[in-house]
């Protein structure tokens, strides 16, 4: 049984070393650092998995590894067929082979050539990222010659190999690692590169919150014996949708889900691919699209045929960007979909100033409702202000949800649940089967412990608090000042407010007093009033006398 605590420590050390190497070469806090660190990490993971599988296959076939490498009796072809879900390597692409060339003057080119070969193998075509216009982006690029001057390249490559050799650490030991293990590693890998800065599609949902949202969604109905199609239209690095896939499979990743995503960010799409590869989700990689979801959605009822209409999904989960400048595409979004109900409540107008404040999340909510199958379920992270806004698109959306009886509940989260934004957030849970049921509104805003993360303050929910939120929602528990169950009619009476606090009972506290205590209280209040009245009269007298002393000078 592997020591996962030690494995995690070793993996994090390698990530730290790679970041330190970039720093000493003047690449710290640059886009090139992110590409180098994540690419080397991915190469190391895929290499070790290939070698581990090669050894396992040779043992099962009772042959030597050398016979498999040489493709004796077509053994290598049989190996590729057996492990078709993994990225294909040849032995010449491996760390074990390349270390034999460390002393050569052009070592870095040997390494980069291996990366390009891996990307170009026909077996690896499905591991490319596709853009909305059909372009394929490979697994690897030239991560050294593209970013470093010639004089530094060999030393840089040799340092990389000093960190990733198998005698220091072998990813093959993590073959049985579960999603929780890999999600922790993945979060550490990208923590410096995936900042929720407010720009489009750069949001990262904390793993614990993603897990809680996934649990609630899955427990909203019994899981059937089928493959569910699940979707995130603003996927970022995939935390939300992959936690949902894991929950649907009851910890057996991908057993119950086919994942579909789209995201405009190149960086986030790269991160998502790494996340998928760590968890062996090759079947869904072809559904990971880089592109503008609102302007050019990429998933259709008939694959590749936009005239067939947008594809609908069993589950949708999303933490969309709240505000960003999309003025350059706003009119196209409105015009192209005018004949449909995709944006039934409207598209935010372009303001004269502060275009970066355009509420793009309102378009994502409408897109999600449009893309959800009859009987489908969704979770959407929104700014808490959306719950009570009484004008414009916000209210129209809430009214549409309530009038169609699609709301299952809302959970209002503590402030600063995301370290890089102070915006208060809530999670809408949509259920198109909740026609006659009641709606549960949860106010979890007082939970959590405040901690310092860098220069920012963050609220961290304990596992006990997360379990309380999940259990309260799933079991529809009513708790004073925490959760309340309301009907659709009552929500209409409250102007379609989704805020739990507006439905809590107002409590008036009564204190039992004796006749003597009552008389004493009244006398105390009377004395205080008499004192205040006396002071008031004295002040009035002083002001009038001061006014009499004023003279007109000219």
Segments (PLM) and residue ranges:
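A short, mixed-charge helix-start or loop-turn motif at secondary-structure junctions
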Residues: 195-196, 254-255, 347-351
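Helical mechanochemical/support elements of P-loop NTPase systems and associated helical scaffolds
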Residues: 14, 29-33, 181, 185, ...
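A conserved structural/catalytic subdomain of Rossmann-like adenosyl-cofactor enzymes
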Residues: 2, 300-302, 307-554
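Soluble or luminal CAZymes and related metallo-dependent hydrolases
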Residues: 10, 264, 360
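Non-catalytic alpha-helical coupling and interface elements of nucleotide-dependent molecular machines
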Residues: 41-45, 169, 190, 194, ...
